[in-house]
Amino acid sequence: MNQNQLISVEDIVFRYRKDAERRALDGVSLQVYEGEWLAIVGHNGSGKSTLARALNGLILPESGDIEVAGIQLTEESVWEVRKKIGMVFQNPDNQFVGTTVRDDVAFGLENNGVPREEMIERVDWAVKQVNMQDFLDQEPHHLSGGQKQRVAIAGVIAARPDIIILDEATSMLDPIGREEVLETVRHLKEQGMATVISITHDLNEAAKADRIIVMNGGKKYAEGPPEEIFKLNKELVRIGLDLPFSFQLSQLLRENGLALEENHLTQEGLVKELWTLQSKM
């Protein structure tokens, strides 16, 4: 993984009301590196979505510093920072402004004054990256939830941001739609097209990331690669998170005498080892 620092957050504090005792963000510091997939996880009210909004300048912290791609985030620089970051939100139906997929992906480019020929090239390129090139003339309401989110991602990457933030972008999708979106994210990351930050309460999704930050009570609770974070096990359950099914099943099988090499973070890894064990019997 590239270790060029893309985002630096230093000791930020945020309250939704200035007179509130509770801090939605309470002294949070973190770094995001170019080319990585970072998952920020936590239960409802942990501060993870507030942090996403702070990174994009939708809210400004009352103290502390945020720097994005070398730009200090302030009221004056917020629009410059937003050119570096694209966001995909929770409800795909709230994100469409065009009457067709083509119009929707082109909308942000038109607003930014991109020349028509370049805009056509960017739209065609973006929809191919998310495998939606066969739906360019479809009306958005005819698409499935997963397809809608893939179109939303196409609209983001057409603008060529350095960073994509997925704010609970899979939480309203069925399992098929969720997997479609996560496969799209994996493809974008592997092709080096963007740094990805996914905000989620779903540890099955977070297990696919390079690194996880766990939020709790507005503070950073833990940080590390997925295999290290899941060793916290009961601590994660205690703060309101559900361990991935594959991890729980791996634990149960090992406790009952099956010689698995590890507690698997993904179903694919668990199935692969079970097949290997079966072939040796």
From Swiss-Prot:
GO molecular function per UniProt: ATP binding; ATP hydrolysis activity; ATPase-coupled transmembrane transporter activity
Task: List keywords of the entry alphabetically.
Answer: ATP-binding, Cell membrane, Membrane, Nucleotide-binding, Translocase, Transport
Its main subcellular localisation, reduced to a broad class, is membrane
What residues make up the catalytic site? E168 (proton acceptor)
Name the GO cellular-component terms. ATP-binding cassette (ABC) transporter complex
Q: Which residues bind ATP?
A: G42, H43, N44, G45, S46, G47, K48, S49
Per UniProt, what is the membrane topology? Peripheral membrane protein
SUBUNIT field: Forms a stable energy-coupling factor (ECF) transporter complex composed of 2 membrane-embedded substrate-binding proteins (S component), 2 ATP-binding proteins (A component) and 2 transmembrane proteins (T component).
User: Briefly, what is this protein's role?
Assistant: ATP-binding (A) component of a common energy-coupling factor (ECF) ABC-transporter complex. Unlike classic ABC transporters this ECF transporter provides the energy necessary to transport a number of different substrates.
Designated name of the protein: Energy-coupling factor transporter ATP-binding protein EcfA1
State which gene encodes it: ecfA
